[in-house]
Structures are given as structure tokens and as C-alpha cells.
Swiss-Prot record:
Highest taxon above the source species: Eukaryota
The name this protein goes by in its record: Myosin-IIIb
Lineage summary: Eukaryota, Metazoa, Chordata, Craniata, Vertebrata
Residues at which ATP binds: I33, G34, K35, G36, T37, Y38, G39, K40, V41, K56
Gene it is expressed from: MYO3B
Enzyme Commission number(s): 2.7.11.1
């Protein structure tokens, strides 16, 4: 484990506790001084000299060893300084019963801490004067300067860590969390310290891993300590420490409670210490020159004595209880304490009094404490804080992972975790519905839910996780814009489905988009802007000097993004935020998987839309026709055509004219200026709408899981709905009408799940429950959606009439919509009002018919299909679905799950690029479709996705209309609570049963909790009761066929079930491991036996093969020798014998693979003519001896284990009476290449030639017997028997022809059971073992 504090590396054994001295030999405890962070502090006396000291006694707890060691190392390393406590040493007191103790002996500071001094004075109605405060701060600054000069950051400067001596000295203590740097410029990034004194940059390190800080964090802490010296407590002292971590970075720098009561220098000193930007904050050295501190110069001794007198006076007062503020260390896990200890109720259901005032009071108090989340049973209320909070870090993600909901404060992560756990436990799809007004924080809540689900999903593929996290940012850049009430308002509906494996691993995602507000492309209301992406791309291309490449102007803004202020271009070129957002969008494209060519095409289409907006039209007056139009600014036309890669002439023709087909004839008619402008705007809207739809489809293609994974495992989904919120502007048009109808549908969905279905089941199951009244908006939805007299049906009907106007539309509404929800205001012709669930809204009917028709001339489509831009061709070649979006396409790409395990990703099928997934019921004729019909089908499609899953609701509330942080408008919040039915929801969640489960499903799901695994309990009431009682639940009810449970019951049951399954999984893991090990052992043994059998068979085969080769060679050699013997016998004594060739020895060595050698030798007499006829094959010794009494034939035999040589030599009885040794010459056996030992090629058939030359009657050839092993002695016996038998039948041979075994042969000696033949005049060794060169060569061979 690496040490937290830089220079020293943590090792539990580094301290060497056993080597430390025993303190009892030197120190003796006198009394208790106080309690430290990790142990008590005592006053001790030195037994040797009687000096006093303070000792901090600590138990060597493992998780504190690092801080103990850090303090020890720093104290030992740090030189002495008057303003830093002295260190006398560390001791270890061993105790085997209760464990040893560490003693840190320090300088005794009898005066206590400055905090105790200040509190004591305040209790007596006094306070420290400014001179004394400046003296204490001066001493603290000197101590900090000493630390910083030695490259040490204290990181826990506070009043309790500034001690005083009885003489008035100021000492810094407690270095447990100090950091020692390796360089004065090196910064730290560990969030550690006591929360009230922690600097903002230190807190930021917990949330932002690229943040860091330097030694000036001690300056901030000293500033807080200065306030503590003045007021007695640090700022926010009455708040829970966890909440201070949220407040400090966001609040302005704190000040004294009553700054006017203190001098200007003191206030200025505090303000300098508490500069939030630490880069601008002064260092300790600079603060020593501050006027407030410089006032101490020359008065140090006087102020020291005065402080000592004050301390002396305080000793006579009653002691003040010491307030401890515990340190927090983010590297050490901790849990946030229960909110009930320091705040109001987390769950409104637990309130004793349920009324509007109580609920509003609860929400307001929690919002003031930045507790923006509150439960209503299993429903989460989220108040928009209008500021960034530090409660969404990975540390908080770990807190909200598989724990009970009540274990932690309410959080958006808890709702995400509840949906995830239900999905994994119940194997059922989930749906998280986020609703609320525009600007209430729905989009950000959706971001956080996706973030937490990716954390819980633990994607094996890190790239997939990054892709999913980038999806929202990319889609929102194209689908969000700035409105009058929200700077990041969603102008489309989004349903994001995150797909998981059955084990809960995220494997992909899919987005469904609904009803994009395309009209915003061409026109925006006052104080509103176009879609974000237009500003991002303009700023990015301007920064890259590429505006000219896309034919965009650098001075005057395009008409589609210009506003009434005229500052758009200045904002685009000067604001860094736009440029950074452009870089972020490029990063999103790259991470998700878009190619550079695709991104470039997207940019060209966006630039083309902006250039199209600059095209203007003018009327052409002629003698016969005055409604003709032309394009006066040809440059804008040329720019648009160039960027879109189409012909400018064709584009102009498509804009200024249109074709009409009548009775088979095509008539070209000119467009008026107004109609040409409408065609231009319709073209821009179509381009942007289809481009947005293509981006969504492309994202879905890049993030889709492998089909084999889905089909094999049957994955599950968690859907997140982020839809545009309820809107009510000063002028509301057709867009707001569609948005508010969609919100009515979501509210109806909420009412059905929370109220209607629950109370209906109470009646059906015979449950006695008090009915809860709620506002049912079903009649209002019928007014909108029913046919043929619903509002949308009437709108479509009027849109089909060419002569219809907006006035006739309003009149038709008034004639047919006769209900309390519709009214017509007097005095306003083109307006109508609707009473929505969220309040009354007045709509302007101007342009509603044209917006609903949303016609796109076919001439424009034809021109755009001729573009050289492949993407643009694709946008207008793919048909639209019933929801108005492009049909999904497939391309040759790598799916998101390609990096999942191989058994999931096998068998991918490749399809052709741009292959359209055509469904007859999806594709439709765009000429007959209207925006209202698209919208109706979008709602149907959205609900079909939502009803599949189990819902989880997040109700976002906007606390004020000014978007101000910490501002709570009771009237606005109460109106939203009433409209969304939160008050009724509190009541039904308190009284009702939100979970109704069939007996069969309940028993099947939870029977593990009460029955053993091999039992199969019946799906009866008794089984359900047994499970519920075993789980120790109460307040549940059984109906006729269902179990009725509270919202918290299911959570408890799921936690218990996970615990049981966890234990089962552990047992299964051990069992599977044991079975696997045993199975592997058997397989290994079987394989070893098989290997042995294969090896044995091979060895046998190889031995037989080699033996066969050796046998054949020996047979051939024996036949050759036999032929030679026959020839010699036929010549007899009549052949002249030369003295030099009387006895010749032929030795032949046959080499075989595997180092098997056979030595064959023969001694025979040959005539001079025979030696010549052999062509040198048989060589004779240069010193050939005379005929010996006995010439021996040397034979060798080979066994499978190696080569054994059995050779004989002749007795040394020559004819002349001299001892001669016949020479032996080795010849290799002929190999496949026919090479001799010396490499000379042998003539084929040379041996056969010898046999043919001496054609004599062959005597019966005796086959030589092979020795099977060295231990076999029967060969010699059989050989002797054979010789005796042959000798008895034949005439005695001559001495040179008789085959005998030499008694002196070494091999024969080891085999023969009889005594060796005695040597006769054996003064020389056999030539086979002689030291001659030839003999050595043979032996080596």
C-alpha cells in the first residue's frame, strides 16, 4: 500500500514497534490533559530529570498506522522551531492482553488550545482583543512558514491544533495528515482535513481528479481559524460536516459575524486568507507583511506576557468542554450518517402531520441545507439547486450500490440503484420516468442516472462505458437550445434504453427520439436561441480558421442564428465556452465511433443549412405574370449549393418553381416570394430533422449489442425518459401544445400506476383501504387524442382543406370541443385556452395549420438526392417511419459488444451498407402525414416501451423562476406539488400498498427465504405467510390472489434474497471448484495413461523397425562372409599364399539411427588376384602377419538398448614363432547414399560381385544369433554346441577357418560362466583395446 503523504511509503512494519524503547523506564503519567483525534493525551514526568511533557497514547490500529507513521516521520524530520511543538521521541509499551500502545512524547503546552481560550472568554462575556489575535496568528504564521520552508503542508490548521504554553508561547501541533512534498512546486490532490477548515481546492479534489492544491491551503484554514478566534466558532459550525463540503465551494468567502465590530485590518487579513482562487491567494510569507500582522513587531514580549496573564486568569474559571471536530479522509471509506440526526425527514411519508404547510416547510428547510432530494415512499422529489454540487463523485456511487434505501440520504443514485437491483433480482425491464416543468433539472437528472447505471453495470469494455456516457452530450448538442426559462432546454423527447446481460453487465444502449422542434431552426422567439450545435460549430470553425471552407461569413451572422441584439458574432468569437463545447462534441463523435468522413459530412450539412437561410427572394414583375420570384443574392445560393454538393441552378429552380402533374402532363409553375421562402425554410427544417434522426440511428448502430448476446441471454433494459417539460410562455404556439399534451400523457401514466391501478386492485382483492382522491386527467387526454372529434383529429382534418385558415381552425375547435378544459378568450381572434393539469395555457393559433402540414416539395427532394455528399443522398433516400423519423439502417460496423467475451460475439452476420429495415407498418407516405399524426404515433410508441417495464418516478421541481441558487418560492413550489399530485402521492404511499404480487410469483421469487432448495412449496397463502413471517415483516396484507406490500417491503425482501443467493453462490463456487479439480485430476491421469500407452507403442514399433534393419544388414553381411569362406575353401592349399596377405582382417561397422552399431569382422585368406578383384573394398594390413594357429572372427551384436561389441582376437602363435597381431580396419556399412567412411562412393553390387566371382557350391549358412540382452549367455552355449555338432559331421578345417571365441574378450569375460582361457605368452593387449591410432579411432567411434 502506498503511503498517502508522498515522501514516505507506508509499510506497517516500518516503524519497528518491537525495537522502540519502553516508555515506563523513562516517563510516568501524572494526569489526563484531553482527548486527541486517535487517542488520549496525558501529562507525564521524566523519571530521570523531573521534566514535564505531554504524551499522546495511541493504539496501533491498522487503519491509523499510516497517519501515526506520517506524524512520526515529520516530527523526526522537522528541525526545532519556537512555534512548532518539540518532539521527544516515540515509545512502545507492549501488552499481550489488550495490545500494545504507541507513545508520542511531545512538548507540554499547559495553556491548552486557542479554541478553549476563546470559548472560555466568550462564556465570561469577553473576547480576545485584536492585538492578542494578531500575536497568535503571527506565531501560527511563523510555524507554518517553517513547515512550508521544509516542504511540509499541515492540512489541518485549526484552533484546536494551535496550543499555548503557560508563558504565552504559540505552538503548532498534530501532523497526522500533513503532507511532505518532494519539491516546492509539487501539488497534492488528496482531499483531507477537518471539513469546516478545508479549503475549496482541497474539497474539489474529491470531485475533480485533475484538481490539485499547494501549501496555500493552509492559508485558507488559517483564515477560518482567524474567524474562530473572533467569533468562537468556524463558519457553518452548526451544520453537519458532510453538508459543509457542499457549501464551502459554492458559498462566497465567509466573514466575521459582525465585521463592523472589528478593525479594518483584521477584516482585510481574513479576506486575503479566504480568496477562493488559491492561485491569487497570498502565501504565508506575504501574509507576514500584512499590516495586521506587522503590528505585532516590537510588541512580541509584551503581548506574550499579556497572553500568559490571560491564560492564568482562565485557569481560575470553570473548565470549558472541548469541542472535537473529527477529520475526514476521502481515501478512507466512510458512510454518511443518518440524516435524521442532523436534518429533517428524508421521507415525507414519515411525517406525523400531512398537509401542504408541513410538506412545504420540510422541502424549504432541506433546500436551504442543500438537501435537494426527498423521498415520497419510493418516489423521488428533486429540487433544482441551480448550482453544481459535489455529491456525484465515484465515492457517492459506491455509497449507493446495493444498500438499503434508508441507509443513506435521498439521492438520484438511489433511484438508479433501485431500478438496477429490481432488474437483476426480478429479471424484469425497468423504466425511470423523469418529469417536471421546463428548467426543473430533468436533463441533468437523466445524465446522473446514466452515469450511475454505467457504474453499476461494470462494463467489461471501458470503451462502451465511455460511449454511453458521451451519448447524452452529443444528442443534447443537436436537440437542446436556450429558451427564455432554461438555458439548456430539451426540444425533443428522448427515451434512452440501457441494455444489460442477465447478470447485470451493461452491453449496449438505444435512443428513441420524438417530436424534434424543427421549426426552431428557421425562427426563434425573443430571448431564445437556435439549437446549440450551430453556435458550437461556428465558434469551432472560426477558431480553426475554417469558416471559408464551409462558405460561412466571418462578420455578419447567418440569418438563422442572428438575434435582435446583434452580438451573436461577438459572443461566438469571444466566448471560450462555445469553442470548448465544439471540442467536446468532436470528442463525443470520436469516442462513440463516428468516422472523420461522417463528421465532416455532418458539418457540411449544418453549414449548408446556415447558408440556405441566407438565400433571399425578390419578385419579378413582367407583362403577363407578377408572382414570379428570383434569387437576388446569387452568392448565398452558390455557397449553399457548394457546401451541399449540388448544382446551384437546380437548387434555384427547386426553390423558385414547382412541378404540378395534371392528367399525365407536367406543368412547371413559378413560386411567389412567400412560397419560395416557405420552400427554403421547409428544406432547412427537413435537412436538420433528418440529420438529427440519422445521428440518433447511427448512435444506435454503434451502441447496439451483438444479436447473439441478446438471443442467447435474453438481456434486460432500464429505460430513462427525458422529455420536454411543461411550458407556458408569453406566446405559446403549436410546439408548446404538443409538448404539453405529451406531459399530460406522462401525468396520466403516473396517475394510473400510483393511484388508479392500486385502488382498483383493492376493490378486486377485497382489501379494506381508504380511497385517495386525485385529479384524473383522462377526460383532458380524450379531448386531445380521441377520434374523430379530438383536437388533433380536427387539426388534421382542417389541414387537408386547401382553403382552410387559422381562423377557421379556431372556429372548428370552438364548435366541437365543448368541455370545461377548452375555452375561447374574448377579444382575441386567433387564440384558444386549455386547462392543463399544471395550469391554464393560452395558445396562439397563428401558423398552426402550416406547421402541421410541414410540406416538403418533391422538387427539393429530387435535387438533394443528386448531391455528391453520400450522407445527404442517404438522408433523402431512406423512408420515414410513422413517428416521422428515418427508418433504422444497418452498416458494416463493429457493434458495441464486440469486446465482450468471445462466446457472446460469435457468428456476426455482415449486411450491406445502408440496408434499410423495412416494416410495412412503419413506412408511410410523407405527403399524407402531418406533424399531429407523427406526434400521435410517437406517443403510442413511447407508451408501448414504458408499459413493458416496472416504473420508477423522479419528480423534478423548479424552486424559482429566476434560476437563482438557494432561492425558494413557496408559491411556485406549491403549485407544482399540486399539479403533479405529490400531496396525494404522500397520502397513498403512507396508507396504500404500492406492490401487489400474485401468490405464485411471490412464492417463486422468495421461497428461498423460508424453504430449502429441494422443497417445492405450493403457491398458497400459507406459503406466502411463512415467507413473510420468516422475513420478519409487518404491515402486509393478503388479498384473494395477491400479496399487498408497502414500498419498503420489497426492498427488504430483495436485500434478504440477495444475501441468501450470495451465500448459495459461495457454496456453489466452492463445490464447483472441488468438482472441477477432481474432474481435472481424472482427466490428467487418463491423459497420462494414454500418453504412456502411445509412448510404449511407439518405442515398440521403433525398436522392431530398427531391429529389422539390423537383422537385414547382418543377414547380408553373413551371406557375404559365407561367400568369402566358400571361395577360400574352394582354393584350398593349392593356392599360393603371399606372406604379406596370409591373414587379413576385415572389420565392418554398420551405423544405424539411434547410435546402434554393429561390428562385423572376418579373417580369411585371399589370393592376390582376389584382393585386386575386390577393387579396394577389402584392405589388408601393411604388416600382415603369417598364418596364425587360430584366427578369430570378431562379431558384434546390437540390442535395443544400445550397441554391444563382441569381438575376438587370435592367439599369438604365428608360423614363424613370432607374436604378431593381425591388424583390424573399420569400414562403415553402406548407407542410402552409398558413401564409405571416407566419403568415397561405393560401387553398387560390389559385394554381390565377390559372390558371383567365386561361384562354388554353397554350404549351409548358419544364421548368426542375436543377443537379446547382455545377460543372455545362451548364445555362447548354443554356438559351442553348433561348432561341436559341425565338427562331428565335417572334416576339420584349417586353423584359419575355424570360428572360435577368444577367451580373452572383455565382453565374453562378463558373460561366460566358466573361467577365462589362460593366456599364453600374452604380452600384448588385443588390438581392439590397443592404444594405436586406429584402435583409438574405433573406440571413439
Amino acid at each position: 500500500m502506498k503511503h498517502l503523504y508522498g515522501l514516505f511509503h507506508y509499510n506497517p512494519m516500518m516503524l519497528g514497534l518491537e525495537s522502540l524503547p519502553d516508555p515506563t523506564d523513562t516517563w510516568e503519567i501524572i494526569e489526563t490533559i484531553g482527548k486527541g483525534t486517535y487517542g488520549k493525551v496525558y501529562k507525564v514526568t521524566n523519571k530521570r530529570d523531573g521534566s514535564l511533557a505531554a504524551v499522546k497514547i495511541l493504539d496501533p490500529v491498522s487503519d491509523m498506522d499510516e497517519e501515526i507513521e506520517a506524524e512520526y516521520n515529520i516530527l523526526q524530520f522537522l528541525p526545532n522551531h519556537p512555534n512548532v511543538v518539540k518532539f521527544y521521541g516515540m515509545f512502545y509499551k507492549a501488552d499481550h492482553c489488550v495490545g500494545g500502545q504507541l507513545w508520542l512524547v511531545l512538548e507540554l503546552c499547559n495553556g491548552g488550545s486557542v479554541t478553549e481560550l476563546v470559548k472560555g472568554l466568550l462564556r465570561c462575556g469577553q473576547r480576545l482583543d485584536e492585538a492578542m489575535i494578531s500575536y497568535i496568528l503571527y506565531g501560527a504564521l511563523l510555524g507554518l512558514q517553517h513547515l512550508h520552508n521544509n516542504r511540509i503542508i499541515h492540512r489541518d490548521v485549526k484552533g484546536n491544533n494551535i496550543l499555548l504554553t503557560t508563558e504565552g508561547g504559540v505552538k503548532l501541533v498534530d501532523f497526522g495528515v500533513s503532507a511532505q512534498l518532494t519539491s516546492t512546486r509539487l501539488r497534492r490532490n488528496t482531499s483531507v482535513g477537518t471539513p469546516f477548515w478545508m479549503a475549496p481546492e482541497v474539497i474539489a479534489c474529491e470531485q475533480q481528479y485533475d484538481s490539485s492544491y499547494d501549501a496555500r491551503c493552509d492559508v485558507w484554514s488559517l483564515g477560518i481559524t482567524a474567524i474562530e478566534l473572533g467569533d468562537g466558532d468556524p463558519p457553518l459550525f452548526d451544520m453537519h460536516p458532510v453538508k459543509t463540503l457542499f457549501k464551502i465551494p459554492r458559498n462566497p468567502p465567509p466573514t466575521l459575524l459582525h465585521p463592523e465590530k472589528w478593525c479594518e485590518e483584521f477584516n482585510h487579513f481574513i479576506s486575503q486568507c479566504l480568496i477562493k482562487d488559491f492561485e491569487r491567494r497570498p502565501s504565508v510569507t506575504h501574509l507576514l507583511d500584512h499590516p495586521f500582522i506587522k503590528g505585532v513587531h516590537g510588541k512580541v514580549l509584551f503581548l506574550q506576557k499579556q497572553l500568559a496573564k490571560v491564560l492564568q486568569d482562565q485557569k481560575h474559571q470553570n473548565p470549558v468542554a472541548k469541542t472535537r471536530h473529527e477529520r475526514m479522509h476521502t481515501r478512507r471509506p466512510y458512510h454518511v450518517e443518518d440524516a435524521e440526526k442532523y436534518c429533517l425527514e428524508d421521507d415525507l411519508v414519515n411525517l406525523e402531520v400531512l398537509d401542504e404547510d408541513t410538506i412545504i416547510h420540510q422541502l424549504q428547510k432541506r433546500y436551504a441545507d442543500l438537501l435537494i432530494y426527498t423521498y415520497v415512499g419510493d418516489i423521488l422529489i428533486a429540487l433544482n439547486p441551480f448550482q453544481n454540487l459535489s455529491i456525484y463523485s465515484p465515492q457517492f456511487s459506491r455509497l449507493y450500490h446495493g444498500v438499503k434505501r434508508a441507509s443513506n440520504p435521498p439521492h438520484i443514485f438511489a433511484s438508479a440503484d433501485a431500478a438496477y437491483q429490481c432488474m437483476v433480482t426480478l429479471s424484469k425491464d425497468q423504466c425511470i420516468v423523469i418529469s417536471g416543468e421546463s428548467g426543473s433539472g430533468k436533463t441533468e437528472s437523466a445524465h446522473l442516472i446514466v452515469q450511475h447505471l454505467t457504474f453499476l453495470g461494470k462494463a467489461n469494455n471501458q470503451t462502451l462505458r465511455e460511449k454511453i456516457l458521451q451519448v447524452n452530450s452529443l444528442v443534447e448538442a443537436f436537440g437542446n437550445s436556450c429558451t427564455a426559462i432554461n438555458d439548456n432546454s430539451s426540444r425533443f423527447g428522448k427515451y434512452l434504453e440501457m441494455m444489460f446481460t442477465p447478470t447485470g453487465v451493461v452491453m449496449g444502449a438505444r435512443i428513441s427520439e420524438y417530436l424534434l422542434e424543427k421549426s426552431r431552426v428557421i425562427k426563434q422567439a425573443a430571448r431564445e436561441k437556435n439549437f446549440h450545435i450551430f453556435y458550437y460549430i461556428y465558434a469551432g470553425l472560426h477558431h480553426q480558421k475554417k469558416l471559408s471552407d464551409f462558405r460561412l461569413p466571418e462578420e455578419k451572422p447567418p440569418r438563422y442564428i442572428a438575434d435582435e441584439t446583434g452580438r451573436v458574432m461577438h459572443d461566438i468569437t469571444s466566448k471560450e465556452s462555445y469553442r470548448r463545447q465544439f471540442e467536446a462534441i468532436q470528442h463525443c463523435f470520436r469516442i462513440i465511433g463516428f468516422t472523420d468522413k461522417e463528421v465532416h459530412s455532418v458539418y457540411r450539412i449544418l453549414a449548408g443549412i446556415l447558408n440556405i437561410g441566407n438565400i433571399e427572394f425578390a419578385a419579378i414583375s413582367s407583362q403577363h405574370q407578377t408572382d414570379k420570384s428570383e434569387v437576388p443574392n446569387a452568392e448565398a445560393l452558390q455557397n449553399a449549393a457548394s457546401v451541399l454538393c449540388i448544382s446551384p441552378e437546380e437548387l434555384q429552380e427547386a426553390l423558385t418553381s414547382h412541378c404540378v402533374v395534371t392528367r399525365g402532363e407536367t406543368i412547371i409553375r413559378a413560386n411567389t416570394v412567400d412560397r419560395a421562402a416557405d420552400v427554403r425554410d421547409a428544406m432547412s427544417k427537413a435537412l436538420y430533422g433528418r440529420l438529427f434522426s440519422w445521428i440518433v440511428n447511427r448512435i444506435n448502430t454503434l451502441l447496439q449489442p451483438d444479436e447473439n448476446i441478446c438471443s442467447a441471454g435474453g438481456g434486460m433494459n432500464v429505460g430513462i425518459l427525458d422529455i420536454f417539460g411543461f411550458e407556458n410562455f408569453q406566446r405559446n404556439s403549436f410546439e408548446q401544445l404538443c409538448i404539453n399534451i405529451a406531459n399530460e400523457q406522462i401525468q396520466y401514466y403516473f396517475n394510473q400506476h400510483v393511484f388508479a391501478l392500486e385502488q382498483m386492485e383493492y376493490q378486486n382483492e377485497g382489501i379494506d383501504a381508504v380511497p385517495v382522491e386525485y385529479e384524473d386527467n383522462r377526460p383532458l387526454l380524450d379531448m386531445f387524442l380521441q377520434k374523430p372529434l379530438g383536437l388533433l383529429a380536427l387539426l388534421d382534418e382542417e389541414s387537408r382543406f386547401p382553403q382552410a385558415t387559422d381562423q377557421t381552425l379556431v372556429d372548428k375547435f370552438e364548435d366541437n370541443l365543448r368541455c370545461k378544459y377548452f375555452w375561447r378568450p374574448k377579444g382575441v381572434e386567433l387564440c384558444f385556452g386549455i386547462q392543463h393539469y399544471a395550469g391554464k395555457v393560452l395558445y396562439d393559433a397563428s401558423g398552426v395549420l402550416e406547421k402541421n402540414r410541414d410540406t416538403l416539395p418533391a422538387d427539393v427532394v429530387v435535387v438533394l438526392r443528386t448531391s455528391e455528399n453520400k450522407l445527404l443522398q442517404q438522408l433523402f433516400s431512406i423512408p420515414l417511419t410513422k413517428t416521422g423519423n428515418l427508418a433504422q439502417t444497418r452498416a458494416r460496423i463493429t457493434v458495441a459488444s464486440s469486446s465482450l467475451p468471445p462466446h457472446f460475439s460469435a457468428g456476426k452476420a455482415k449486411v450491406d451498407t445502408l440496408e434499410v429495415i423495412r416494416h410495412p407498418e412503419e413506412t408511410t407516405n410523407m405527403k399524407r402525414q402531418t406533424v399531429a399524426s407523427y406526434f400521435r404515433y410517437s406517443l403510442m410508441d413511447l407508451l408501448s416501451k414504458m408499459v413493458v417495464g416496472q416504473p420508477h418516478f423522479v419528480r423534478c421541481i423548479k424552486p424559482n423562476d429566476d434560476r437563482e441558487a438557494l432561492q425558494f418560492s413557496r408559491e411556485r413550489v406549491l403549485a407544482q406539488l399540486r399539479s403533479t399530485g405529490i400531496l396525494e402521492t404522500v397520502s397513498i404511499r403512507r396508507q396504500g400498498y404500492s406492490h401487489r404480487i400474485l401468490f405464485e410469483e411471490f412464492v417463486k421469487r422468495y421461497y428461498y427465504l423460508a424453504f430449502t432448495a429441494h422443497q417445492t412449496p405450493l403457491a398458497s397463502k400459507e406459503s406466502c405467510v411463512a415467507i413473510l413471517e420468516k422475513s420478519r415483516l409487518d404491515h402486509w396484507v393478503l388479498g384473494k390472489t395477491k400479496v399487498f406490500l408497502k414500498y419498503y417491503h420489497v426492498e427488504q425482501l430483495n436485500l434478504l434474497l440477495r444475501e441468501v443467493i450470495g451465500r448459495v453462490v459461495v457454496l456453489q463456487a466452492y463445490t464447483k471448484g472441488w468438482l472441477g479439480a477432481r474432474r481435472y485430476k481424472r482427466v490428467r491421469e487418463k491423459r497420462e495413461k494414454g500418453a504412456i500407452a502411445i509412448q510404449s507403442a511407439w518405442r515398440g514399433y521403433d525398436a522392431r523397425r530398427k531391429f529389422k534393419k539390423i537383422s537385414n544388414r547382418r543377414n547380408e553381411s553373413a551371406a557375404h562372409n559365407q561367400a568369402g569362406d566358400t571361395s577360400n575353401q574352394s582354393s584350398g592349399p593349392h593356392s599360393p599364399v603371399a606372406a604379406g596377405t596370409r591373414g587379413s582382417a576385415e572389420v565392418q561397422d554398420c551405423s544405424e539411427p539411434g547410435d546402434h552399431k554393429v561390428l562385423r569382422g572376418s579373417v580369411h585368406r585371399r589370393s592376390h588376384s582376389q584382393a585386386e578383384s575386390n577393387n579396394g573394398r577389402t584392405q589388408t594390413s601393411s604388416n600382415s602377419p603369417a598364418v596364425t594357429e587360430k584366427n578369430g572372427h570378431s562379431q558384434a551384436q546390437s540390442s535395443p538398448k544400445g550397441c554391444d561389441i563382441f569381438a575376438g582376437h587370435a592367439n599369438k602363435h604365428s608360423v614363424s614363432g613370432t607374436d604378431l597381431l593381425s591388424s583390424r580396419i573399420c569400414h562403415p556399412a553402406p548407407d542410402q547414399q552409398g558413401l564409405s567412411l571416407w566419403g568415397a562412393p561405393q560401387k553398387p553390387g560390389s559385394e554381390n560381385g565377390l559372390a558371383q566371382k567365386h561361384r562354388t557350391p554353397r554350404r549351409r549358412c548358419q544364421q548368426p544369433k542375436m543377443l537379446s540382452s547382455p545377460e543372455d549367455t545362451m548364445y555362447y552355449n548354443q554356438l559351442n554346441g553348433t561348432l561341436e555338432y559341425q565338427g562331428s559331421k565335417r572334416k576339420p578345417r584349417k586353423l584359419g577357418q575355424i570360428k572360435v571365441l577368444d577367451g580373452e574378450d572383455e565382453y565374453y569375460k562378463s558373460l561366460s560362466p566358466v573361467d577365462c582361457i589362460p593366456e599364453e605368452n600374452n604380452s600384448a593387449h588385443p588390438s581392439f583395446f590397443s592404444s594405436s591410432s586406429k584402435g583409438d579411432s574405433f573406440a571413439q567411434h
